[in-house]
A protein has these predicted regions:
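Basic, glycine/lysine-rich polyanion-binding surfaces/domains
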Residues: 1-183
């Protein structure tokens, strides 16, 4: 499993910061949504609810499941739990139609924090990120300055963003420019 040791420059101001989050392994999970018995197996093995509504996030024991589509979830699992989890999934799901692929080397997770985090992101994002509309427990696939990302709030002033590795440096550069007015 990849641990994505590539580092990116951090940004830190009094009202906005961004740093890479490296404590998770990312699993893309696909399954047959018509097989009503498969999600309870995933849920039991992962100790995480994957049977979630569109554009929502499930969290348990520090792990996250993000709804990406009717048959797709992105799961963030603590790095030290991934090997046991993969073995248990293979054993319990034997003979079923599913896939789980470790995608950590292809995507980077950034934690954005600060009282202006939503304002900085909204400068390049068409989704309304106001607290009234985008709350903890929700996720969205969108674009920031034409770069595809997945966003989800962890706390009121803490948003986690997942971006493809090949666009991570461009996104950091965009955030450097976007946060200037808030310094």
């Amino acid at each position: 499993m990849s641990d994505n040791r590539s580092t990116y420059p951090n940004i830190s101001t009094s009202v906005f910061s961004i740093e890479q989050e490296m404590n998770f392994t990312q699993l893309n999970i696909r399954f047959d949504p018509t097989d009503i018995s498969i999600l309870p197996i995933f849920n039991g093995v992962m100790d995480l609810n994957l049977d979630i509504a569109p554009n929502t996030v499930s969290k348990h024991s520090g792990n996250f499941a993000l709804w990406l589509g009717p048959d797709e979830r992105l799961v963030l699992v603590a790095n030290d739990k991934i090997l046991d989890l993969a073995q248990r999934l293979e054993r319990e799901l034997n003979g079923r139609h599913y896939s789980f692929i470790e995608v950590s080397s292809g995507q980077v997770i950034f934690d954005l924090k600060g009282k202006e985090v939503r304002n900085v992101i909204s400068k390049g994002c068409s989704v309304d990120l106001h607290h009234k509309y985008f709350n903890i427990g929700q996720c969205v696939q969108t674009a920031i300055d034409k770069i595809n990302v997945i966003c989800f709030p962890i706390e009121e002033n803490h948003i986690r963003i997942i971006v493809r590795t090949s666009y991570a440096r461009a996104l950091i550069g965009w955030f450097k420019d976007a946060c200037l007015e808030f310094i």
